[in-house]
Swiss-Prot record:
Residues 638-681 are annotated as: Disordered. One of its GO terms (molecular function) is G protein-coupled receptor activity. Residues 669-681 have a biased composition (Polar residues). The keyword Glycoprotein applies. This is Metabotropic glutamate receptor-like protein L. The chain crosses the membrane at residues 371-391, 402-422, 436-456, 480-500, 532-552, 569-589, 598-618.
Amino acid sequence: MKLIIKNLILLLVSCLYFLSNVSCDQEVHMALLLEGQVDDLGINYEVNQGLAETEALIQRAAKVINDANSYDSTYDNIKSLLDQDNPYNLIITSSESQMSAALDIASDYEDTYFLIFGDMGDKKVPHSKVGTYYFNLVSPHFVLGFIAGGMGKSVGMVVPGPPTENYFTANAFYAGMKYYTSPAGAPNPSLSVVATSSYDDYDTATGAGRILLTKDIDICTQSQTDMTVANMFLNASKWAFGTNGFPQSNIYGNRIIQSVVHNFQVPFYEAATMVMKNTWKNGYNFFGDFNNNFFYLDYYSFLVDPLLKNQTEDLISTIKGGAKPYITNGLTYEKILEQTKLSTGITDLGYYAVPTTEVYTTGSINKTFMAVSILEMAICLIIGIIVIFFFSRNINIIYSTIPYCLTILLGASLIAVAIFLWNLRDLNTQICTSKIWMASLGYNVLIGFIIIKSSLIYFKFKEMVKSKNEKISPIPFGRIVLWFVPLLIIDCVLLIIYSTSGNPGKIDSLGLDGIGRYEYTQNCVNNLTGDIILYIILVFHGLQLLYGCVIAWKTRVIDLEEFIEAHDFATAIYLITFCSFIIVILMVGVTSTSNRNTIISACAIFSSFSCVLIIFGAKFWKIYKPVEDDGLPQIKLKPQKSYSGSGGSGNSSGSKSKKTSAHSSTSGVKSGTSAPTQTSQSAMASINIQNFVNPIEASSRAAAQNDN
């Protein structure tokens, strides 16, 4: 019995010991985001290959998402991976373009592990479960440059160039060429570099490759993500290096002298293992290089001498041992990455860009608007001359005042100038800024002076009705200006902010409005602040129109001939408001910049030109053809009792007749009317109602009768 108990205790202790040494692995659900397609035989292929090897090692399936090449697509894809019933707990990115989105969403998911690709620099990870990985950007090109130096060939290299990528790849390659000690009598290798401002643009890479092929260059290399330039050299029976992480000899054979292969399985497996074993290192950072087997060389081409192979392997061993032969002249690795100039000895072939052609398909439309705007300015000038020199003493002009008439013409002319600038072909910053100023100030003057005078007329009319005062006098121009100054200040402040903070300017827009990729049109642009200020300016003018419609509705009851222009003002305001609604409706469905400019120009010309014709056309028509008797009957008033003081119809008529006579003398016309005198109760007074309500027309008829 004791033996049985002893054996049971021993068995229990053994089980406890065994269980205590068994690790409780955590389930791993990996997901990888690629910037491009998995089958590109480049960086995306190698990243996916590293994930596939990691899957085999940990025996866990993973998910791969292609084309996560923007902030929004990266953020949305990661969020969908984490908001599932069985969420992924290890998210891996593969491009620096995905870094910002991954860091942002990682701050909201502190229980999820992230392995983010890229150089963090001064950025901080949001929590301890966020790790990073990157690789040496210099050592691979240094090693390939060493091989090129040993071959003694002329090499051409295509790089993005600053500001897309500094010249550290070209300088590292050239440093490797010089690091090789050529034997006596061996040819000196050379390096020529062309920049394209892009990692993967096919057209610019092709153009850069053509430049290198015309320079009697034997071998090409590059720091781009595809093999466009290499293919051009291989098709021309020349040779190339593989630099995008894929073992290019698998495709092109011995025509690829050597490739530096990226082994992404190393960081992926290390991160997945830490998640499984729950041994994640805070601040985990992997920096790939030859010393941790992230980089390794592909098969050598038969073109490489065996001695050079051995020398290259010795160089790799030196780097694995911790040496950094690519660091010269006391520069640190970080300083090498900051090099914006090519090293002395490199032939700089400059930047290549695909030639662009300007497209100008709206020439006839623009010329038409420019001609109409010039015509509008000319008509405004002619009207101003006529008002000043021919009708300055006409009562229709006197009640408007000459300065007011000229100010209305000035506002319309400023709008015409804006439309002229809007349709110029050759643009610059000054033109782009000036057209906004002219349009805003023009409408501010035109609308502002109309609504202010309409308001003053309405207030004066209400005061006359309230006080029963029949004395009528023109609205002083100075009073209108005083009311307009605040509107002008607001407009100028907004325009100054737009000019200083909105950064308006001209840009050559490639491929805009359906034209070719390398065709461009000149357009005016501004930044986000400029857009906001423009919207505020539009709201400002919209409020002016809204108030104008209200005051126009109120002035409909004014029947005094001296203030009849208030009805013309109302028509002008309604017209501008209608055009504004038309612009909004048309602009909603229009995406073409040229079509938008056409709509703006047409509505601006129509509204401003029509306002001038409405306001001054009515005035000139009354001057040219005074209103005749409208056929109203001569009403004989019955005898009324005479009251003390001024009263009764006779006095009222007499007062009105005196005022009419004064108006006639002011306009240079001698009045032939006289006020009837009040007699006894039996006297009969006969008046013409038209003389009472329309004194200007009465004086005009009197002048016509005298002429006869």
